Amino acid sequence: MLRAIPRVANLEGYATGCKNALKETMYLSNWYDGGAVWNEFLMQRSFVSRYPVVKFQGCLGGYLGDAPGSMYFIEVKLNEFGEFFLFKHPAAFITIPYSLINGHYSHYTNILPHNLNEIIDALILLMNKPNASLDEILGIIKGPDFPFGCEIRINKEELYQIYMSGQGDIEILSHVLTNGSSVSISHYPPFIEEFGIDDYFDLKGFEQEFNGKFEKGDTVFHLQTNEPEALMKKMADSPILKRKVPIDFNFIVKREVKCVGIKRILSCFISNLQQQYAKRYEGCSPSEVNDMIIKEWEKIKSTFGDERRTTITIVK
């Protein structure tokens, strides 16, 4: 995708039609399933991807389930993140674990997105101290960080087990604001956009039972009723307010799909990166290679690092 968009647009910074970019992506990657490629494009929307590499122009749908427009009527171009890695600093793209910061979802794995600053700080820690404990790593990586913000409630021991084994479930909660007869729900759990909020909440039943009104915005869902407490009790178990999301750090290890912990993922990434830099810069000592890699990380962090959007609440 990164290489296809500028090839079709011909000039850096110009937008091109998604249909043309999709065809070029299929050609460069030898991928013949256009629907799957289009889904990969839609994964780069700002409310789905934590650090998208492209920017769209057109009707992209909404997080509450509104369908996107046709690819014929949507344009796409590289954003600052994508231009930095493709044009300004091509060597930097391999220096960060893209699947960890943006997440990766498939039949075999479910990696949730993480904060760029935290991942880079954990990489620097393991670079300088390879025998660092998982507790030290989790002192830096607080947990997943979603693009729309939300709240994660989890036990400290459960969080430790998830990142040690690479598998588990986390509970994600929306932000609910009650003001008199008005209830505003925002910062939803992830994957609501797959089906739409209508599939999780009976709007017609709400109007009849509570004699209320609803208003659906881009990111906020407003409910007007004279019985807000009864409404919240009925919605207590709704996926709109609370949802359990699985985590599976599945990777191919010696030709087998295995679930691995966060420390092994980061350590293997560092080892592979050191080998690549050693080949690229022959004659440099291991310490010089490490210094070059850390400088790349610091540059990426200072350019694109941001604050955590998801709140982590540790419960007993």
Language model regions located:
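Catalytic phosphate-handling regions of large nucleic-acid enzymes and associated NTPases
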Residues: 1-168
